Amino acid sequence: ALCVGLAALFATDADALVVTGATSVGPEDLMPRLLSGTGSLDLHGLAVRPASPTGLGRAPDGRPVLLLPGNPVSCLCAYELLVGPLLRALGGRPDPWSFPHRVVDRELARKLTSKVGRTDFVRVRLDDDGRAVPLATSGASNLSSTVVADGFVLVDADSEGAAPGERVRVHLFDDRP
């Protein structure tokens, strides 16, 4: 069924192809193998939490194919970091890699922890004092933390996080203050 679906996807006239789910490394995660067997799989696995099972390749005709994780928060993160910029570039945007979100500088309400060696996409909400409150970072399928989030903070791969009171750049999901 996935082979038929992938063939149908390749038959479209879309400029880029985006697939969600079945992108990790388990026996049921067939998309990376299918793509490498029919087109090319140029990148699989990112040092980003929670989007690590993301992949990037090409259809047989050279069009970009993005493999996004099936977990909702992982998929959102992969979209923000790869799909959005790719679509903006294909659309002719002059600076496609900049995030389209309004960015605000906020004080952290509590400790934000991260692991050196990977970039973390941390959902945050803004409290009544305007401080950034890190939300649950475990569980890529933890959609509830994203639903209540006002935005996200990207923690660089060389950082262990930030202490309460430190200032962070919050990428807002919408135009609320």
Residue ranges of model-derived segments:
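N-terminal small/polar loop signature for handling phosphorylated ligands or for N-terminal nucleophile
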Residues: 1-37
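Flexible glycine/proline-rich
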Residues: 34-177
